[in-house]
Each structure stands twice: as C-alpha cells, then as structure tokens.
Design a protein with these regions (language model features):
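Long, charge-rich, low-complexity alpha-helical segments
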Residues: 28-76
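A short, structured beta-strand/loop element
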Residues: 3-43
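Intrinsically disordered, low-complexity and often Lys/Arg-enriched segments
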Residues: 1-5, 75-76
Length: 76
C-alpha cells in the first residue's frame, strides 16, 4: 500500500500555532526535517522520539516534497 502523508500529518490551530505536526502529537514536521538535515540519522530520531515510526519519517519527506511541488512559490 502506498504511504500517504495525510495519514500521519495534520494542522490544528490550537497546536504549535497551526504548524504541521504528526497526528496525536505536538511534534512538528519542521523539527524532524531539521534534525534530518543536520545529519541526525533516522535511527537516532526514532530512538529519541519513540512515538514515531519509520512511516512518520517517510510521511515528513513526502509532505515536504508536496509543498515544494506546489504551483505557488513560497520564496520571498
């Protein structure tokens, strides 16, 4: 079955100022992507955040790709 980021990520106004978070948590997708970008391994992230699974990390990457692929530019 194809993984859908929508199954793992949500935005709620009352949680983390509406930033995308992993469902059922206050953990932002932004934070996890920053951790990956600074060189933290997936194994380290999963050990540090036991509520996450490898599928959550894949969902974060798919979410990021979806944003980049949008027709509207986010650059200022």
């Amino acid at each position: 079955m194809k993984l859908k980021w929508q199954d793992y990520i949500e935005e709620r106004k009352e949680v983390m100022m509406g930033k995308p978070v992993f469902k059922g948590t206050r953990l932002t997708v932004e934070h996890i992507l920053q951790e990956l970008g600074t060189g933290m391994s997936q194994e380290e992230i999963l050990a540090g955040y036991p509520q996450l699974t490898p599928e959550h990390l894949r969902a974060a990457m798919l979410f990021s790709a979806a944003l980049i692929g949008m027709d509207q530019s986010i650059y200022v």
